[in-house]
Amino acid sequence: QREKRISEINTGIYFVDAAFLFSGIKRIKRENAQGEYYLPDLIEMAVKQKERVAALTHINAAEVMGINNRIELSEANEVMRKRINNELMLSGVTMLNPENIYIHHGVKIGKDTVIYPNAFLEGSAEIGERCVIEEGCKIINSAIGDGSVIKSHSVIESSQVGQNVSIGPFARLRPECII
């Protein structure tokens, strides 16, 4: 009952004096159902030794959320998807229905590019300025030149598309195509 009222979580992030850490680890006992070493036991040791101990709060709980099952993994993915999309929109990319656009971290997209729903941009994809990526497109590890239009449901993989080129709809560029 008492545990249910606790509104804090252990993020697993610790700042610890190295000497204390190494001596403390040797003294941690594995007296639990899993037979595991519990690093939080170091906190109790530190308190008993009158070491300085402090808990910190984080302004954004989503940044330190635990992931212990597929639901929490999905929630963490959603946090990251929103962060990536928001950063791109603030830099001048237009997203029509950003809730349904999936862009991997590290993808580069130029200003004034418009991305339609259900687009997937993955790996080291680079999209130039003033491009249009229509609905249902998947672009993986490819470069799309400025002013190009990738029409609906096209798949481009490990290829290069030049400037002011129109691809699709329903096109498939296999690896190493240069258009």
Q: What feature does the model see in each segment?
A:
Residues 77-106:
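Long, charged amphipathic helices and adjacent flexible linkers at domain junctions
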Residues 1, 174-179:
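Short, intrinsically disordered, charge-balanced linker/junction segments flanking boundaries
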Residues 97-99, 104-105, 110-111, 116-117, ...:
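Left-handed beta-helix
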Residues 30, 81-82, 118, 130:
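Short, solvent-exposed amphipathic alpha-helical segments in soluble enzyme
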Residues 1-81:
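Catalytic-core segments of class I nucleotidyltransferases/pyrophosphorylases
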